[in-house]
Amino acid sequence: MEQKSIRKAIIPAAGWGTRFLPQTKAMPKEMLPIVDKPVIQYVVEEAVAAGIEDVILVTGWHKRAIEDHFDRSLELEKYLQARGKKKEFSEIKRIAELANFIYIRQKGDLYGNAIPIITAEPVVGDEFFAVLWGDEFIWADPPRLSQMLKVYKKYKGAVISAVRIEKK
């Protein structure tokens, strides 16, 4: 297969978030805020900055808030415009237009990191793609995905990221 640029990213976001209970009983862990936005928004923005065009979010039945976050809300937009809240209006519109969002509902009681990737196979086809965890935020300069795509282009093969953890 000829090497092409990576345009698609799969973001698994179907888990229960049990390590964060009780906070995640009513809110997906991917929607937990870091400062002023949910962690998954940082992940999507990093992907888009690295050249990703199609963001494939593999979610579960209890993750509707993720879809709502990245979707347009015409009622909210109208409300904000009527009250002159231009900054807020621009930001929610920008979020909805970050990428081409594709949502896939993970079915059944299957569990594991490979299941969302297999679930997204019909959308990805035979293209190379990135996998980003919807609840993982790593601050790096340059951003981690950009670093990985640079390695991918240089060596023309799969790339896995690792983080060194200091012993205490």
Task: List the model feature ranges, each with a label.
Residues 2-82, 101, 106, 142-147:
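N-terminal glycine-rich phosphate-binding loop and ensuing alpha1 helix
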Residues 76-78, 86-168:
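Conserved beta-loop-beta/alpha segment of the NTase-like Rossmann-fold superfamily
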